[in-house]
Design a protein with these regions (language model features):
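Conserved donor nucleotide-binding strand/loop of the catalytic core
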Residues: 60-63, 74-104
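Hydrophobic helical membrane-anchoring modules
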Residues: 1-31, 170-172, 195-277
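Short, well-formed alpha-helical segments that are part of the catalytic scaffolds
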Residues: 18-26, 42-57
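Acceptor/aglycone-binding surface of glycosyltransferases and processive sugar-polymer synthases
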Residues: 89-104, 112, 122-200, 227-246
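A conserved acidic beta->alpha catalytic loop
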Residues: 66-75, 117
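Acidic helix N-cap motif at the loop->helix transition within catalytic regions
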Residues: 46-50, 71-80
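Cell-envelope/extracellular polymer assembly enzymes that use nucleotide-activated donors
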Residues: 34-36, 61, 205
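Donor nucleotide-sugar binding loop of glycosyltransferases
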Residues: 44-47, 69, 94, 120
Length: 277
C-alpha cells in the first residue's frame, strides 16, 4: 500500500495555497465533528473529475483509494482536488479498497461514495444529520419514500428484495435496501466492520454487523443515478451468490468482541422517536 502526498502530482502553488487556506478554515472549530469522504477508484478517469467537484466544500478530507488504475485516474483527481489524500492499494475488490480508506480516514465521521457518479455527493448532509442526532450509522436506501434508482434492473431489484427479507428474518432490523454502497458512520465503529469481505458483499456485511452489534442505524432516502461513463464491474449472479453466502455464514459466526470508543453525541428523546433501527 502506498500513500501519496496530496501535492505529489500538482505544480500549481496557487491552487495548493487556496486549498490549504480552506482546510485551515474548516479546522479548530470547537465541538465540530470532522468529516472524511472515502472514494474507491479503479480506472474511473472520466467519472472522477465530475464527481469530486460535487463534494461539499466543508468536507474536511477526501480519501481516494485507487486499486492500480492505468488510465490516469489519480493524476486527473489530483488536478481537480489537489488536497486529496491518495492511497494506492491494489488488493482486488471494493471491500478491500473501502477498508483501506477507513483505516486512513482521520475524520470523526466517514462517508463512503462511489466514483462512477451513481451516488450524489450533494446528499452527504442528509447522511450527516442523523449521525449528529445520535445514530451510529446511516445507510442510503433506494426504496423508501423520496428515493429511487435509474440504474437497478428488475432482476437486481428482486434479488435485493429477497436478500433484504432474509436479513430481516435472520437478524431483525427494518432495512429496506441491503445492497447499496452509500453509507456514513462514526469512525469509532470501524472495528465492527473489521475483516469484512473484499468484494461487493462488504455493503451487506456492514449492515449485518451493525445489527449484530446493536448499532443505532438510520436509513435515509437516496437516489441512485446511472454511472456516467463506462461499464460496472458488478456481476448480478456471482455477486448475488457471494452476498447470500455472506448472510448465511455470518449467522453462524460468533460476532467479534468489540470495545467501541465513547460516542461524541447522545441519543435524545426527540431523536429517539424517529425510528432508529
Amino acid at each position: 500500500m502506498v500513500v501519496l502526498p496530496s501535492t505529489a502530482l500538482v505544480e500549481d502553488r496557487t491552487v495548493i495555497d487556496l486549498t490549504d487556506r480552506a482546510s485551515q478554515l474548516r479546522q479548530h472549530v470547537p465541538g465540530r465533528a470532522t468529516v472524511s469522504v472515502v472514494v474507491p477508484t479503479l480506472n474511473e478517469v472520466d467519472n472522477i473529475v465530475l464527481v469530486l467537484p460535487r463534494i461539499p466544500w466543508w468536507v474536511d478530507e477526501i480519501v481516494l483509494v485507487d486499486g492500480g488504475s492505468t488510465d490516469g485516474t489519480v493524476a486527473a483527481a489530483l488536478a481537480v482536488r489537489p488536497d486529496l489524500r491518495v492511497i494506492i492499494d491494489e488488493t482486488p475488490g471494493k471491500g478491500a479498497a473501502l477498508r483501506a480508506g477507513w483505516h486512513h480516514a482521520r475524520g470523526d465521521i466517514v462517508v463512503t461514495i462511489d466514483a462512477d457518479g451513481s451516488t450524489d455527493p450533494a446528499e452527504i448532509p442528509a447522511f450527516i444529520g442523523p449521525l449528529l442526532a445520535g445514530a451510529d450509522m446511516v445507510k442510503g436506501s433506494r426504496f423508501v419514500h423520496g428515493a429511487g434508482s435509474a440504474d437497478i434492473d428488475l432482476l437486481r431489484r428482486a434479488g435485493n428484495k429477497a436478500l433484504t427479507r432474509l436479513v430481516r428474518m435472520l437478524y431483525g432490523g427494518r432495512f429496506t435496501d441491503l445492497c447499496y454502497g452509500y453509507n456514513a458512520f462514526w469512525r469509532r465503529v470501524v472495528p465492527v466492520f473489521e475483516a469484512a469481505g473484499d468484494g461487493f458483499e462488504i455493503e451487506t456485511l456492514m449492515n449485518v454487523r451493525a445489527l449484530r452489534h446493536d448499532l443505532r442505524v438510520v436509513e435515509v432516502a437516496s437516489f441512485e443515478a446511472e454511472r456516467i461513463h463506462g461499464q460496472s464491474n458488478l456481476r448480478t449472479f456471482s455477486d448475488g451468490w457471494r452476498v447470500l453466502r455472506t448472510i448465511l455464514r455470518e449467522r453462524f459466526r460468533r460476532p467479534p468482541e468489540v470495545e467501541l470508543a465513547p460516542a461524541m453525541v447522545r441519543l435524545t428523546p426527540a431523536t429517539a422517536e424517529r425510528g432508529w433501527s
